[in-house]
């Protein structure tokens, strides 16, 4: 029961567009859940982009995605190393927003 109440206060984690509210722990957990949702969309879009790509595009796409993951992780680590509890929120929002942006970018590849 308590976990359900906490999740409800932390925003509707089922809606990736809804904001995360609550205390720091609840907001961090909400951001993790939203990042996981966007990561799932990203992985689906990536697999579809690989499938739709002509053979000559596949290796560059794989390389770009590997480098993008490294960049995202390093970039968000920078925010996570800040001072205070806000750094955890900054890092979580960094992961969520960068993952969302990349997912939407890859989803758009099929429309070009």
Located regions from the model:
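N-terminal alpha-helical modules
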Residues: 8-112
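Classic N-terminal secretory signal peptides
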Residues: 1-9
């Amino acid at each position: 029961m308590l976990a359900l109440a906490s999740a409800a206060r932390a925003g509707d984690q089922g809606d990736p567009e809804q904001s995360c509210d609550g205390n720091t722990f609840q907001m961090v957990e909400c951001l993790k859940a939203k990042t996981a949702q966007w990561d799932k969309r990203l992985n689906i879009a990536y697999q579809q982009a690989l499938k739709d790509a002509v053979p000559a595009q596949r290796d560059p796409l794989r390389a770009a995605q590997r480098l993008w993951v490294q960049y995202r992780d390093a970039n968000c680590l920078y925010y996570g190393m800040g001072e205070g509890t806000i750094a955890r929120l900054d890092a979580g929002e960094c992961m969520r927003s960068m993952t969302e942006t990349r997912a939407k970018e890859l989803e758009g590849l099929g429309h070009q």
